[in-house]
């Protein structure tokens, strides 16, 4: 039961963070950096799959490692670094003109969001005990 609650908490946290980050804070930067590749038609289903995958990563790779708030932040940030790093470095390798500046900001965001989601998982797990 705790695993399911951690998954749902992570899933909701990812959505909230991404809506704030992508929809408000970083939107002008993303438009400037990614204009050649952006679509005008937002597709919900791929976003939902991404949020499910990120929540699964937190649930099964970060949550079992959490023994303190510090380890939550460390493992969450590390997962964010790996996921966003693979995405951005793959894009830099295969997409002509993929901006390094965007990649660095995106990877940093992956680490921050991963850490924040892990913090939520940590506090929820403490609440459930």
Label every model-predicted segment:
Residues 1-129:
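Juxtamembrane/disordered regions of integral membrane proteins
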């Amino acid at each position: 039961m705790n695993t399911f609650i951690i998954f749902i908490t992570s899933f909701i946290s990812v959505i909230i963070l991404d809506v704030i980050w992508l929809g408000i804070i970083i939107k002008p930067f993303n438009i400037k950096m990614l204009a050649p590749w952006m679509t005008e038609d937002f597709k919900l289903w791929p976003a939902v799959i991404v949020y499910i995958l990120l929540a699964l990563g937190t649930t099964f790779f970060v949550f079992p490692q959490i023994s303190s708030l510090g380890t939550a932040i460390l493992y969450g940030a590390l997962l964010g670094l790996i996921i966003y790093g693979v995405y951005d470095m793959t894009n830099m390798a295969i997409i002509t003109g993929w901006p390094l500046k965007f990649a660095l900001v995106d990877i940093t965001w992956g680490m921050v969001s991963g850490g924040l989601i892990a913090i939520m998982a940590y506090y929820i797990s403490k609440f459930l005990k």
